[in-house]
Amino acid sequence: GYRLVHSSYEHLNHKEILALAKILLESRALEPVELHGILDKLIAECPPEERSIIEGIIKSETFYYVPLKHGKKLLNRLWDLSLAIRGQEILHIRYTRMDGIHREHLVKPVAILFSEYYFYLVSFKEEESEYPTIFRVDRIEEMEKTGKTFQIPYANRFKDGEFRKRVQFMYPGPLRRVKFTYSGPSVEAVLDRLPTAQILEEKDGVYTITAEAYGIGIDMWLGSQGDRVKILKN
C-alpha cells in the first residue's frame, strides 16, 4: 500500500535569526562585506515587523563591528577546502607562519574547525604523521589541487568532533591525559573549557579533575588559572 508522508519546510524564526546574528557578530570571524551579506539574508527571512526589531537590536553591534586584522574574505576558501575534504584530495598549499616565514606543504585535509576568531584547517602532512597539523585558514596564501587523492579506511576516519574536544587553542601534538586540582569559584567553567574533563572527587571545595587533550594548549590554559590549579600528573 501507500502511505502519505507529510513534508514541510520550516523557515528560521526571528528568535533563531537573532541568536545566529549575535553569534556571527561576536565571533568576528568574517570581514564586513561577507558578514553583512549573511546578516542581510538572515534578517530578510523575517516578517517586516520582526525584521525591524532585530535590526534595532543589532544596529550598534553592526555599526561598531571590528573585523580581524587579516582582512581576508574566507567564504570561497572555506567552501573550496570543504570540497577537497569531501573528495579526499591532496592539496599543495603556500602558508605564512605567525613569524612571517612562508612554507609550502602537501597536505591531506580532513576537517575545518572554528575556534576563538579563526577558522582552522586540520590535515595530515603528505609524509605520514601520527597526529594532524593545524593551519589557520586566513594564512593559507595559495591552494592548488594536485590531482591526487588519499584513502582513509572508514574505521580510521578523522572524527573532528572528538578531536575538537581534545584540542585547546589549536595547538596540535600527541594525545595526553592530565590530572589536576581546581579550587576556583566555578568548576563549571573548567568543564566547559575542557569538554573531556571528568571530576574524580571533591573535598572542601577542591576538585580533582582529569582530562584528555592534544598538544600543549591545555598547559597554557591551566597555567593561566594561577594558584587555583595544581597539576598532579602531566
Question: Predicted regions span which residues?
Answer:
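Minor-groove-contacting beta-hairpin "wing" of winged helix-turn-helix DNA-binding domains
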Residues: 1-6
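Short, surface-exposed beta-strand/loop "edge" segments at domain boundaries and coil↔beta transitions
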Residues: 10-12, 100-103, 128-130, 187-190, ...
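Bulky hydrophobic/aromatic content
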Residues: 11-96
